[in-house]
UniProtKB/Swiss-Prot annotation:
It is found in: Cell surface. It comes from the Bacteria. This is Pneumococcal vaccine antigen A homolog. One of its GO terms (cellular component) is cell surface. Its main location: other. Signal peptide: none annotated.
Amino acid sequence: MFRLLKRACSFLLLFVIYQSFVIHHNVQRVLAYKPMVEKTLAENDTKANVDLVLAMIYTETKGGEADVMQSSESSSGQKNSITDSQASIEHGVNLLSHNLALAEEAGVDSWTAVQAYNFGTAYIDYIAEHGGQNTVDLATTYSKTVVAPSLGNTSGQTYFYYHPLALISGGKLYKNGGNIYYSREVHFNLYLIELMSLF
């Protein structure tokens, strides 16, 4: 029994070390975009900041695709239509800046603007009409009743989403319903990047 426990602990330790290495590698890849993000932000009148944009890049692609901010769908309505990281960041920053301005105008929290990057800008009005504060419960309802049906999921079909923040809340997402945990993941990744930048 002790040998089995020791083996399990060794395996767990190796897994944690490996995951730490992978996360560190991904963070360094995202940080390589920092000068590009700084330049783009300097050219825009925006409330967005470098750390937030980098956390969004980490959340979207971990810096591993040309369309680092997954800007294609909001730009052209088609996936992978942007094949240049500079164009992706420019469009992503423009959309985020627009969302932040709309959120301020509507009197809602800035994390609503971040969640709207995933759900679409109409989410800002929805939150304004439902208390002014983005929550997982409101995001879940919006995903189920607005986003998913608009993209063909009228039956409320779900799938399991393997992310620690999702697992805490049950781990399900609605098919074609966006990511209800998006703003929470970005928030978490802000701290993750900050932590991994120390090493």
